[in-house]
A protein has these predicted regions:
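Short cysteine/histidine-rich metal-coordination sites, predominantly Zn2+-binding motifs
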Residues: 35-41, 68-77
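Short Cys/His-centered divalent metal-binding micro-motifs
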Residues: 49-72
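Short functional micro-motifs and their immediate structural scaffolds
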Residues: 24-31, 61
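Short flanking/linker segments adjacent to small metal-binding domains or redox-active Cys/His motifs
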Residues: 84-129
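Short, charged surface segments at domain edges that flank catalytic/cofactor-binding sites
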Residues: 1-23, 42-43, 47
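Histidine-centered catalytic micro-motifs used for acid/base chemistry in nuclease
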Residues: 18-20, 29-37
Length: 129
């Protein structure tokens, strides 16, 4: 595990056992999402990173492709989480969950280039209720 992941896990102390998008957190598998993308000048520093699982990371970039407003709103919440210095609050988790459900409602029948639905079952397996 990288030093920056260890530092983030120590700072944000995920007592909820959820990543920042409400998926079950497996510390050894967690990924770092750049809030401001590297290609847009975003640094690999704690204030520009969020802790999300690989499925969540893949899903977040699908959301970026299909609905940039939702993507930007989720990233704004991630910025607030970094400013507060602890894992997302219940209210922040509820907003993220609402945004994800809205996206799923609007795009549940969208298909990719191979004719398969773009919202995979694994994207719906969040643990926040």
């Amino acid at each position: 595990m990288s030093q920056i992941k260890k530092e983030m896990l120590e700072i944000y102390k995920p007592y909820s056992n959820m990543d920042w998008m409400n998926y079950k957190l497996v510390k050894s598998d967690v990924t770092l999402h750049h809030i401001i993308k590297k290609e847009n000048g975003g640094n690999k520093c704690i204030s520009n990173l969020s802790l999300i699982m690989p499925n969540a990371h893949q899903y977040l970039h699908l959301i970026e492709y299909k609905d940039i407003e939702t993507y930007n709103t989720i990233n704004k919440i991630f910025k607030y989480v970094n400013q507060q210095g602890y894992e997302p609050t219940i209210e922040q988790r509820e907003i993220i969950e609402y945004l994800l459900k809205q996206f799923e409602s609007e795009h549940k029948w969208d298909k990719g280039s191979k004719g398969k639905l773009i919202i995979k079952r694994k994207y719906l397996e969040r643990i926040y209720k």
